[in-house]
Amino acid sequence: MVHGYKGVQFQNWAKTYGCSPEVYYQPTSVEEVREVLALAREQKKKVKVVGGGHSPSDIACTDGFMIHMGKMNRVLQVDKEKKQITVEAGILLADLHPQLDEHGLAMSNLGAVSDVTVAGVIGSGTHNTGIKHGILATQVVALTLMTADGEVLECSESRNADVFQAARVHLGCLGIILTVTLQCVPQFHLQETSFPSTLKEVLDNLDSHLKRSEYFRFLWFPHTENVSIIYQDHTNKAPSSASNWFWDYAIGFYLLEFLLWTSTYLPCLVGWINRFFFWMLFNCKKESSNLSHKIFTYECRFKQHVQDWAIPREKTKEALLELKAMLEAHPKVVAHYPVEVRFTRGDDILLSPCFQRDSCYMNIIMYRPYGKDVPRLDYWLAYETIMKKFGGRPHWAKAHNCTQKDFEEMYPTFHKFCDIREKLDPTGMFLNSYLEKVFY
């Protein structure tokens, strides 16, 4: 019989959200997952699955049963001919990468963080950049899902296709993902080239940049005109690195954290900090190359609050200039660097922020120096207002203030997803306070 633990305290990576589940489970098999759900039905408990805990929101929180899938983390099958790999849903991407390397395979695109589970990555709509590439869930070709009553559904474009269309971005509310089959590509290396520019230049030449680099993104430094452009493209060059402990850590982390903490008492310093660190760290061309997963991912050093919305790609310039104008018109509203701007191909996944449109993701951030929260409400609300104006949809893993009414307007297939959810989980076993705001 599966054993649960009481008294476990859950906190997300940034320590911005947490909860105290009544019982915490770490199942090792499908049967143990089924046992937990049977107990939940019997005791009328809510159930939430947690992965790597990196979501900067309360999407995984519950005061009921919490299931951590970390012990269901095996590679089940590798099909070298089709270049597909089937894994248990609790495997971390950080553990999957070396196993893909062994087989000469890779994922075609990855987010910035690898200490996250496969099920969590797809369920939250995790993305990176590259207008020819979709969110990570578009790499899923099949999955298995256990519903609230313990039934296991095999889902793909040819089996339970309606559930598959919903479950690739499942929000943790359709059931428990057990296995995932990913479409991979041959192993490849990337060269990353970063160089300074201006906001005017990058916005005026956006189409050119998107054509020039397969994985293009840029960082805008609020309260300035400064931009760092980042290209990532296939290469045959030997691995090389531009990293340097003094600049990356002594300056880019320890000094920055101290100055950001100081700015909590003197907010007028934030604009100066953004300019200073652009000129210190981003004002010259840098190049590095390595295996793709080592270029796509990087170390997130700062605890932080973030928002990340997807707007239609053609609205990028207008929306970013409006955000800039808002900050200029309200000098008491301060914004940490960077505003990270990325691009993603449209898809047909029911609750994908990129549903039926190529998208621009505009990520804003406020750091928590030494764990201290920085006033951000005015910045957050102004940003959300601008994103809604331009047809934005929020990243599911990141905090937002949207409700059911908003999502009905944002997603033409919202009610179709709701119908599937209610069919698979008629009692709402997999709901929590975050999801109740979404669906009710």
Curated annotation (Swiss-Prot):
InterPro entries referenced in this protein's UniProt entry, alphabetically: ALO_C, FAD-bd_PCMH, FAD-bd_PCMH-like_sf, FAD-bd_PCMH_sub1, FAD-bd_PCMH_sub2, FAD_lactone_oxidase-like, Oxid_FAD_bind_N, Oxy_OxRdtase_FAD_BS
Keywords noted in UniProt: Ascorbate biosynthesis, Endoplasmic reticulum, FAD, Flavoprotein, Membrane, Microsome, Oxidoreductase, Transmembrane, Transmembrane helix
Record carries keyword Flavoprotein: yes
GO biological process: L-ascorbic acid biosynthetic process
EC identifiers of the protein: 1.1.3.8
Family: Belongs to the oxygen-dependent FAD-linked oxidoreductase family.
Protein's name in the database: L-gulonolactone oxidase
Protein source organism: Rattus norvegicus (Rat)
Organism ancestry: Eukaryota, Metazoa, Chordata, Craniata, Vertebrata
